[in-house]
Amino acid sequence: MPSFYKLRKKIWKSLYLLIIVGMLYIGYILIKSGYINEKNDINVTKKNLNLRDNKNYDLKYNVILQDSIFEGVNKNLNAYKIKTERAIKESGNKYKLDIINAIYNINQDQALIITAKEGFLDQESNILDLKNDIKLFFDEIIFNTNNARINLVNQNIYGNSSAKLLYKNSSITSDSFNTMDENNIIIFKGNVSTIIDLSDY
């Protein structure tokens, strides 16, 4: 019995020794591989730092405003309000606009309603450029065009694309147009065609 006990004790000691040696070996391998990875990380970082020094990164970003409202007044202190589904700030106070609905008060009693699919607002110069399916509504007048520039301060509107003015059963079409005298005068230019139904007046 005592020899069996001694044999068992020797086996356990040998087993413990093997486990300790195995753990030391595994620890050595882990430390060695960690050192190699750390060395590689340092080299990669040095390379990245060198690349950063050699390149000038041009960081660009866009500020996108959803459901935005731009407000102001014209020279007669009549208010305007420009609502847009999306406005992308280009630079300073310049915005690219999508899906525009604007109310522009001509005077205290009359408002011009403007819709367009696209536009560009420069708040510094108070210019609103519109394009793509523009409609202007004023009392019973509907005005259609694809390109218009509105000076928000002096109220003048210019357009270099074909335009059509509808009033009840009457109409005027032209290649371009502009307004004067705070929109009291509309000048049609190029291939002007006028249809007047006297019953409208």
Swiss-Prot record:
Q: Name one GO cellular component term.
A: membrane
Sorted alphabetically, the keyword list is: Membrane, Transmembrane, Transmembrane helix
Bilayer disposition of the protein: Single-pass membrane protein
Checking Pfam families in the record gives: LptC
- Residue ranges annotated as transmembrane are 11-31
InterPro entries according to UniProt: LipoPS_assembly_LptC-rel (IPR010664)
Compartment(s) where it occurs, according to its Swiss-Prot or TrEMBL record: Membrane
Q: What is this protein called?
A: Uncharacterized protein RP506
Please tell me the species this chain comes from: Rickettsia prowazekii (strain Madrid E)
